[in-house]
Design a protein with these regions (language model features):
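A cross-domain feature marking catalytic cores of carbohydrate-active enzymes
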Residues: 1-5, 31-36, 98-100
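Aromatic-rich peripheral "rim/lid" segments of glycoside hydrolase catalytic domains that contact
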Residues: 10-26, 36-141
């Protein structure tokens, strides 16, 4: 399953249903390309067709100077809930992979609108773990 997620557009229960369905077929789920965009979703856009492109508008790039605590907290909660899901179904999951190492190199900064600033990974622009990483590690212990 490809994991380009958008905060507010993805439901953990849908992922749970997908994992269970795949497991019922006797195979293991494989998550690839995990990231979580916190930016507004233009035109209710979904998918990753590289030819898709929307015009830049400032209201679609509200976090250029930093992520507000409200959005950071919402993203943290999504990641925690997602990892709880992965742990609940670990026997049914073969692998989990990420799309990028840190926010500075994330494709989400330029897709589908070039020049936006997103915070889609678990590591900041300097490659340092975000606070949620410690919380995820505690879940796994």
């Amino acid at each position: 399953m490809q994991g380009h997620m958008i905060l507010g557009d993805n439901d953990i229960q849908e992922y749970e249903h997908s994992i269970s369905t795949i497991a019922s077929l006797g195979v293991k789920a494989f998550f690839s390309e995990l990231d979580l965009s916190v930016l507004p979703n233009p035109y209710n856009f979904s998918g990753a067709n590289i030819s898709d492109n929307f015009a830049y508008r400032a209201e679609l790039d509200p976090y250029k100077s930093g992520l507000p605590k409200r959005q950071e907290t919402a993203a943290e909660q999504f990641w925690i809930d997602f990892y709880k899901l992965l742990l609940r179904h670990q026997k049914d999951i073969l692998r989990v992979g990420f799309w990028c190492l840190h926010d500075g190199c994330s494709w989400r900064n330029d897709f589908p609108i070039h020049g936006r600033t997103d915070y889609a990974t678990l590591f900041d622009r300097q490659g340092q773990p975000k606070p949620v990483v410690k919380k995820i590690i505690q879940l796994v212990k």
